């Protein structure tokens, strides 16, 4: 195996024996083969589009296939084998459609050479062996490999956001078309400039997709609003829901109503507490625990069923006993966990098994008490715009520091807690994603009633932070987003954070600090391009970085 898509990859070069995430070699290789098959689908999809006969029948499959390969999403080899088999069947159906259209248009059979991703075939007994030859290292040139993987890794993040929007009935053809264009491009001999242009286009598509998901979430569930979220527990048994899928959240709340079973969020589902549509449920108690990497002891002490709607799912440790109450749904898979099937057309997922099991479980063990505040997405912050602008003009707020992104296991991430603790009292932290758990329970106070930590929501709600920045640029009459009193100190872990990073670069943001390490998939030459064009920089010491940010550097 060779995998370097996450921040915790071995020695910051790549995992070759077993993933630092816990992913076995066999699973990693099957993920590579699935991407290979998706490239084959994309090749024929692109060719049909060129002939004026675009085929949209594989759009959902492509999104879900990319999403399933995100770090800590799917650990189930059988699920990957099934997706690969389905992908090959879909590709071959698409090939036949293309060959027929080509012959009808040109009066002759198609005879040009095609990449292997468009032609290889084999049954499940051949998957393991084939997977070894189609991975990342199949591309020999280091810089070409780096640019292709930067594109694919960013594409995985965009696909995750597009899939969430699609579940709510929101999609844009341009996003689905770009999925095919980007995947197919990685089978072509393109110039460096062409590949860089595609990476930047992925950043633009990340903005489009996050905007679409924002529209989907807020149209369906209302605009997030300032909310005090309980982090204690009640006396009833509960169900813990983690991940990002708000439709799963909505259906679970509805089905648990009146059952005597409470619902708690975990990890990236915390922002569900901010949406008006969910506040009407009195049995929605609050949030339990911290970010994804702390889940083993937290899932253990929760006592009730746990539902993983998306990443991040961490492998169970030997001492863990909660596998019999672990449920997955959507693209998530884990051998031994129960999987909740997709909703039928026009229907809802069936969570009755979780509810029945919850009724037999003791209530959650209390691990903390109190509350945290959030709900500062763009609609809410812009409603406070006059107050914020006045605070900036008066000097009460000297600087905003965007500390969005992911949390992770590495001890070096204490940097983000220390930055939050040591920033001057006239600064405000803007955050989204699970990076917030490094400082959202600190008592950092407020500035004239404006909390010093403004949590916009999930990682995709980094879009809100971009909207806020663009609005401030307009209010202050600035020509360049980089002239704002805003610094970016971003923590990354998985592929959605890469999509967010590309979105910020597309919007012209420069001087981003990215940590705790720069991505292993950036070759020295590609990293140099990002440094020279966008002034991306690694994190340094807490005091040096704070001093630089306060000086606008």
Swiss-Prot record:
GO BP annotation list: response to hydrogen peroxide
On the tree of life, the source organism's domain of life is Bacteria
Could you tell me where this protein is found in the cell?
Cytoplasm
User: Which GO terms of the molecular function aspect are on file?
Assistant: 4 iron, 4 sulfur cluster binding; hydroxylamine reductase activity; metal ion binding; peroxidase activity
Q: Give residue numbers for the modification (Cysteine persulfide).
A: 406
Write down the chemical reaction(s) this protein catalyses.
A + NH4(+) + H2O = hydroxylamine + AH2 + H(+)
What would be one Gene Ontology cellular-component term for the protein? cytoplasm
Q: Where does [4Fe-4S] cluster bind?
A: 3, 6, 15, 21
- Asked whether the UniProt record includes Nuclease among its keywords, one would answer no
Q: What is its main location?
A: cytoplasm
Question: Which key words are in the record?
Answer: 4Fe-4S, Cytoplasm, Iron, Iron-sulfur, Metal-binding, Oxidoreductase
Q: Which InterPro entries match?
A: HCP/CODH (IPR004137), Hydroxylam_reduct (IPR010048), Prismane-like_a/b-sand (IPR016099), Prismane-like_sf (IPR011254), Prismane_a-bundle (IPR016100)
User: EC no.?
Assistant: 1.7.99.1
Free-text cofactor note: Binds 1 spin-admixed [4Fe-4S] cluster. Binds 1 hybrid [4Fe-2O-2S] cluster.
For the keyword Cytoplasm, the answer is yes
Q: Where does hybrid [4Fe-2O-2S] cluster bind?
A: 244, 268, 312, 406, 434, 459, 494, 496
**Cofactor(s) annotated in UniProt:** [4Fe-4S] cluster; hybrid [4Fe-2O-2S] cluster
Q: What does this protein do?
A: Catalyzes the reduction of hydroxylamine to form NH(3) and H(2)O.
Q: Which family does it belong to?
A: Belongs to the HCP family.
Tell me the subunit arrangement: Monomer.
Protein name, entry field: Hydroxylamine reductase
Species annotation:
Nitratidesulfovibrio vulgaris (strain ATCC 29579 / DSM 644 / CCUG 34227 / NCIMB 8303 / VKM B-1760 / Hildenborough) (Desulfovibrio vulgaris)
